[in-house]
């Protein structure tokens, strides 16, 4: 039986296709993979350059057809993966570059469930990789402890500094700022992320966050010498030694919370520049945040403490805040704490660094195998550029990026450098590198089906542009996951020593309840161990959640996702005194939301 492809015999074409100068809707209905890939490749260019093509796709069913291709799922076949990626790029181009009516049609075409599934899959892969890395690190550590020969200077019996709980006697002195709100010890969402509130997670030994700038930090007297004779990092093969990332949901008490101090480029010292430390190429420095000043001591005693990278405080994609520093009421009932610089949740972090080992000692025992340290593309490259379009050898979408205005028109991340016309390649995800080193079939199955970093980044960017319309908010707060896109089976195959679980057949998507709120998923990407581009666009999406609905009289919704209560009249709810953007109906909602809100709560200038 003949396929339902259209052909044009008079021009010797086996099927209708889309070119860079001709758009034909029939080409999207092609059932053969190769001509469909060719058409999608040219359509990606057309959706980038032509507003008319974007408008036509909203009325001829083209967007719905592209979303159907995405909902068919990602296959391990290379051609199928290529087809899926091109269709995804086309939808993102339509939503990012289109007008309000075009963006509305993208949301109405049921694109939000696809994005929600991509973000959820990525979070699951991150959690699975971190859990396996921690278990392998523990097994490797116990193997080294069993082979170690005890000496008079051997202190290997002590727990690792990544595992040692913080006690009141071990914490260093710091400045005290009385918080206006006391954070409960148990955060929400703990059914997915269980963490010990007394254990501090750090990203890597070379990225220990500081509670204050280096010139004001108070260190213990033996901070650089307590591990000088520690032999744990001097022997053994550390191929599987993984440094755990900061958890996506860090447990915290009333004393936790990281202070941010943005540093401009013109304030850097020569020793702070990324190119100064040429020997540490495996752990690049952030171009926006320098290292702590190097004190005149020997290289064997160099401190590993660095200042935590600061989040860029940018406005949302739609422009300025709705009402700026409005005169909305505040939740701080203490008249003594009404200063403008005092946040309503005045929290600080303090961290024990007494048992942090020397940098050279730690790096000397780490092999060349991949770890789970996140390397941000904006940190890896000298110029902070990122291009979301996947250019191929046959793609004509080579847009001139010499002009700074073109970068803004492309809808790219504001972290781009205007003087660089070439976009560097994305650094591979540390999680994909981790699974790539595993030779099991299950690991490679996860590698082929897991979302790529650029997929997650484009998803967040598309959400940033469509989530600012309050009339579409119900699509984001009442969504679902696409069954054919989920990777639960692949993740379950990674479990060692467990019997395979018989998963039920995928239920039809139209039968699934719309019980998924996409904003909590997006909020997880504001945590610091994700790349800065992911953090930026996730912060934009969360700030769009705080917009007032002009169609309902300019009222706002409680920013805590489990509440969702709307104001009955304008300025009924109180604003967060720090960012002056989020509103909460009660202090209880603010306490519960602060666990994640602290990552995207930026002080209003």
Swiss-Prot record:
Polar residues bias spans: 279-315
Region (Disordered): 134-187, 203-352
Organism: Aspergillus fumigatus (strain CBS 144.89 / FGSC A1163 / CEA10) (Neosartorya fumigata)
The family this protein is said to belong to: Belongs to the MUB1/samB family.
Pfam families documented for this protein: zf-MYND
Annotated Acidic residues bias: 320-336
GO cellular component: cytoplasm; MUB1-RAD6-UBR2 ubiquitin ligase complex
Xref: InterPro entries: ARM-type_fold, MYND-type_zinc_finger, Znf_MYND
Protein name: MYND-type zinc finger protein samB
Record keyword Plastid present: no
Keywords: Cytoplasm, Metal-binding, Sporulation, Zinc, Zinc-finger
Binding positions for Zn(2+) per the UniProt entry: 576, 579, 597, 601
PANTHER family the UniProt entry points to: MYND-TYPE ZINC FINGER PROTEIN MUB1 (PTHR47442:SF1)
Localization (cell): Cytoplasm
Function (record text): Involved in determination of the onset of polarized growth and morphogenesis. Plays a role in the regulation of branching in hyphae and spore formation.
Zinc finger (MYND-type): 560-601
Molecular function terms, GO-annotated: zinc ion binding
Keyword Ribosomal protein: no
One GO BP: sporulation resulting in formation of a cellular spore
